Amino acid sequence: MFQSRMENVISSFYLEEDTTQNKLVEDAYLNAELYNQQLFLDQKREKYDTILNLTSTQIMATIQIPVIDVDLAIYHGTSDEVLNRGIGHFEFSSLPVGGKNSHCILTGHRGMPSAKLFTRLDELKKKDRIYIHVCKKTLVYEVVDSFVVEPEDILDMGIEEGQDLLSLVTCTPYGINTKRLVVKAKRIFPKKKVQPRKSYSIRELLFLMIPVVFLIVFKVVKR
């Protein structure tokens, strides 16, 4: 049930993103990069919720980890509401657009009865790949380390100068949840062409557009 809803919302996100003018998407990506640069220089976080917020789905990006069958939406913040419907982005960390001097930290539940989310995160090994799809781009990260920390130590996971890092966080031990498992990955640039996220046929696009159009009409009528 959860995965079916997740597939639908991700499909809607991709559809809206694909039908957004390239200039707007490029501007959104550049704004996120500027945000990350400012975060590295002075730790200021301004207009966080408005950046990477291109669609009505509220999704900022998606994450795919083929080796553990993860394909999930990423949302702003780490509230209970966010973590019950997908993967959360720690506001104090870099946005998921990559670049030098960036460290994006994402978190997800483990062992939820209704959803797997990051349940299998402990199965990741060095060199396993993680894909972030954002603003019509695909960023590739490779696992370099995994370790366990206290919950409060997550706040100390800062940016490493010159590095482009991604860390995934979930609760551990399984079912006890007193500590945090961290899987750390580093950006790579594969020579082989990266498999892009799913593309849709005309028939699929028309079918997926129905709820999007309905939402737009509803908002207009509500005004």
Stretches found by the model and what they are:
Residues 213-223:
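Juxtamembrane interface at the cytosolic side of transmembrane helices
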Residues 1-208:
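Solvent-exposed, non-transmembrane regions of membrane-associated and secreted proteins
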